[in-house]
Amino acid sequence: MNPVQNTHRAVAALGAEASSTRLRAMLLGRHPDPSVVTALVQRCAVEPDFFVRDMLTWALTRLPEAVTLPKLRAELTSEQAQARSQALHSLSKINNRSVYPSIVGTLLRDPDDEVARAAWRAAVALAPEGEQRALAAELVTQLGRGDRDVRLSLSRALVGLGAAARPALAAGVNSPDPRTREHAHATLLLLRDPEADYAELVEEARRLVAGRLDPMGREKEPPC
């Protein structure tokens, strides 16, 4: 069977009921064909299986950027949350920094947690040299947001910016919101030791916020 026939079969397989059949999308990456980009992007928006989505992203990275980037940029304003998050994921894998202005801003504050998390990761990966401090200032506005997984994602994104994140996190430590202060402390601790257990860092941050630790992380002496 020639590559054109393989491509047609792979595109048709994207709508199959069985995820194992939909995984044939990998054929679209083996024989890159710009004509299939619309089908791939559309499927990303609705595909329920993580592994199939990952294969769709891989196939997109194999296509010409002149074709994929406009399609993925358009998905960033989709009403479907999965369309936005998958477009962000694919853009981060394509790794073309020209899309950075399309990511920073409202997507970093997207009401959908999965979209916001994808935006944080993509922004850190694609931030041009010299933009890290400004990005950190944007990211710290989300401190205290969501559950443990969401907070860990934001902490990791800020840690990915390295020392450029310290000034913004220092401001977060002085926030009037205790959740923001706790999250900022935990992130600074993670920045100091990226391999540390995050749950332990959060507990230490809580003690800092509660005033039971001094700035060096030592237990305060109880008052006489």
Roles of regions detected by a PLM:
Residues 113:
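Short, acidic/turn-prone active-site loops that include or flank metal/cofactor-
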Residues 9-17, 39-48, 71-79, 102-110, ...:
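Alpha-solenoid HEAT/Armadillo-like helical repeat scaffolds in large eukaryotic proteins
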Residues 1-4, 12, 19-32, 42-43, ...:
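Structural detector for internal amphipathic alpha-helices that build alpha-solenoid repeat scaffolds
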Residues 133-184:
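Ankyrin-repeat and related helical/solenoid repeat scaffolds used for protein-protein interactions
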Residues 170-224:
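Eukaryotic acidic, Ser/Thr-rich intrinsically disordered low-complexity regions
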